[in-house]
Amino acid sequence: MTTQVSFATRVGRSVLAALGAVSLSAAVLTAPAHAADTGLFGTQDATYDGVYRQSLAIAGLAATDARIPAAAVDWLADQQCADGSFEAFRSNTSSPCSPSDPENFSGPDTNSTAMAAIALYLAGRTAPARDAIVWLNNVQNDDWGFPFYAGGASDANSTGLSVVAIQTVQPQDKSGRVPNAQAWIGGLKLKCLSGGGLAYQKGGPANGLASSQAYMGLSGALPVDPVDTLSPNPDCKKRNAVSNVGSFLASAITKDGAVQSDFGSGADYSSTGWAVLGLVANGVGKGAVKSGVSTLTRDVESYTYSDGDLVPAAAGLLLMVAAATDEDPRSFGGINLKRALIGSMQ
């Protein structure tokens, strides 16, 4: 039997960073990092997002062809469990990983593992990246979706990130896992008459973060290459998940300049960044991409800094956005994201 949790419960259990909602979680992750964390990006407590933020940071540097410090990659590789998976953070890497526990949100999870696989692969560590993919394949549910923790119910975010990881690390995969997982994502789409978009889990309302990360899962691998000319914002088509979700995200960004938070607290920069990546990957959303990038560059400081400290996951995501949209990562809204990220490393 699988364990199903609501999106709000998942976030409420301190998994904001694993979902990519670093704009919401940064303020509560402010304790000093452990002294042994040589190579870790950022000074915030790594308990809930160490692997995820490190992975986004490395992926962002790779996307912009920046030098990736060996110590940063070593830190991430050392976090890997014996079976190829990753927990959010292991304070003692000499101790075995605990089992994945969806009831208590502990042990290895798919979000950390997927992002770590992507980062390690882009950094040239192909063997551990492929080990991570093997673990992801083994925890895919019978419905073809992916759970946050093994044994849990499938959800849009976890499925989207896992599919991106498989497409990045093993683009030659012929097992059917990717199209079947994408079909599962398509089953979460809402009617075009209501605006489209994806629910976090079947039966729920449209969810901005779930839609943006799962949209990337429908769109391909990381990093996303820029395109010469984007088509206009896509129309919602009831039988086409890609156009449905793309239309939902493009409409949201065009209307408000950003995907709005699912918790009613204004712009969600993380959802907006993921949405921009997905739109560019599909070659659509000219107006939305322009508007989204304008918001991200304008508000870059409030997104990438918390109490004066860099938020590595935010910087990494914006580096990928910069690479996909031909923005200068050395002056993204006036901030040198590469220098800031490297300078935050322990």
Walk through the language-model features, giving the residues of each.
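Preference for long, amphipathic alpha-helical scaffolds in soluble/luminal domains
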Residues: 2-346
